Amino acid sequence: MAWVKKQAPGDERMQSISKSIKEGALAFLVAEYRLLLVFVGIAAIALGVISMLVDTTHWIIIIAFVIGAFFSALAGNVGMRIATEANARTAEAAKTSLPNALKVSFGGGTVMGLGVAGLAVLGLSLLFFIFVKMFITGNASFYTEMTIALEALAGFSLGAESIALFARVGGGIYTKAADVGADLVGKVEAGIPEDDPRNPATIADNVGDNVGDVAGMGADLFGSYVATVLAAMVLGNYVIKDMSAAAPFTDAFNNMGPILLPLVIAGVGVLASIIGTFLVKISSNDAKEAQVQKALDTGNWAAIVLTAIASWFLIRWMLPMTMEMNFFGVEEAVVVPSRHVFYAAMIGLAVGALISMVTAYYTSLGKKPVLDIVQNSSTGAATNIIAGLAVGMKSTFLSVILFAAAIYGSYTLAGFYGVALAASAMMATTAMQLAIDAFGPIADNAGGVAEMSELEPHVRERTDILDSVGNTTAAVGKGFAIASAALTALALFAAYVTFTGIDGINIFKADVLAMLFVGGMIPVIFSALAMQSVGKAAMEMVKEVRRQFKEIPGIMEGTGTPEYAKCVDISTQAALREMIVPGLITIITPVIIGLVFGAEPLGGYMAGVCVSGVMWAIFQNNAGGAWDNAKKSFEAGVEIDGKMEYKGSDAHKAAVTGDTVGDPFKDTSGPSMNILIKLTCLVGLVIAPILGNHGAETDTGVATETTRVEASSEVIKKVSVDMEVDEQEGVAKAEVVTYVYQNENGIPEVNEKVIAGSLAEVEARLNALKADAVTFQLKKNGAFVNEEG
């Protein structure tokens, strides 16, 4: 951040405009956070009630929730502050060259990306190790105590996602109310350019870029990052439970390798992103969008490849060579080599990259989907909108096929732990992804500062090149976030099923099927409320802008000064008022369904929200992004039916109308879907102990584990081992037969198990088994070694 602040901030007028944008954004955030303090207080009381009702939910979850909410708000605030520092400096850099403008705008994005990812890793790591110190005492089974620790950590994720939802929805309503109002009256009715200082809504529009596309996005990706890592850690605990069935699990990481792995991958991803940021540069002052995009892609791919290489070594180092996992629907434990976990992680990285490519195809300048919308603009706004809707709907096909392949492939390789690791690997380069995403709004703001400061035309041309690339990277980033949300939600869903102790979700039950449909409806209603909120706020903005054009003399001539503050106030009040209902629906609905209908119907509801939410997110994000770049195509000029069309033409006005429809799609309701999906599953996970069999004498859940541990001291255990060792390869395979007697004259319960892996791993597990046995018989490569008892 210090480097960004050292750059020249421009002349006095540029600094004044930048200051107005910063003050407006800060004023909104202060008002928003003041309102959210009330929500955090009420939610903390509710979590306190849950901790009193359920033994396995500790009161510390309240503190974790508050810290998560604070960190999420801080992530958005940090992003907004750096963006408002970088906007005028980017415009000033654009006076000299395009490479300098990219360097400053991407530098601002880098600070935000590294700050958000660093906060996520720091918060998760600190709280996790504090909770491990508090709860892992050895008084109960490791799984039981770790479950309590991770349930407390879920409070951190719940706090982060809750604030992210309100920040995303509130910021989206703010920015699009201003944007739609500015476009409809300024561009379409008055015929003045975007960001023209004569437009009363132009400051509000630029403030909106920061509170929505920067602060909202920062909180959003912070929440996504935390939820993804948490889901993988929870499922890592289940892996340890499965592997402890035959013998106590031991490793060099305090018996926590599968749990710590996603956290370590996240940390390595931050380091890989730092290296990637150094590769983002261009040399030519005549570079166009393609060269800028290539520079960003180079840095992104470098971060992805470095993360993939590091993941291979981390997985080999932190996981046993083989693991036993219980798959749903399979009676016996499945032996999973650690390399399968690596393959699952690579599926996550590959699918994340492929979905980014699919999103880029449907939303980029010069690609067929965008050109189709451009051609349809020649016959008016109606055909433009029809074409945009079709593009958004068609874009779901390839994205969903890729999601499905990722889920099926990663689950087949390593169960739900594989799915969670796929999501973790995908999100590991969040710092780089966020740096790329954030540079777009900074460049957009820089263009606004240049226009309002009446700088030379070449400055705006350079910022427009960056802004155009930023529109595509923003759409790609949203597609990336949806992909991770889908995989994370599935992992959280698996954790929910295990936490509650239910066998699965049976849709042949009437209540489950009914709630499945209710869940499918929620994203539709949520989107409708968000769109309606933007429409209502935009109407207020349009009326105010028209009033000022009519009543303030000299605005169009440039001699009168618009009342910018009134437009800023309209957006602020509308956003704060309208964000409450969608947020409360998201949080309260799963609680009511869970308490009234029970665990399985709530599972049906969660499944409905996930499937429907993913479809609506892809459709809205891609349709909005395509409409936006269809409008921008006219700035350079496009050929329609043999005739060149430019800004100001009837076709361009139709494209502006389409973009105005798409704005709330891509910046308000669309991006909120991935938070809606994850937050629904997180709420279910937090209330799962109330709905499930925690503390009951059942065959599933935490109580079973505790009961078995306590019972094990009352039985007589005899163990027979037949081990084959390959000394050259350093691997071993042991067939273990365990005889458990309730008393010396009773009939034994016989259990058979195969332990395979490196020689050190197998011997460590056999030693743990030996310590728990009354009689231990070992045969190694066909010869008896010892018999103790």
Predicted features, each with a name:
Residues 699-789:
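Short linear regulatory motifs and low-complexity interaction segments
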Residues 1-704:
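Hydrophobic packing and interface segments
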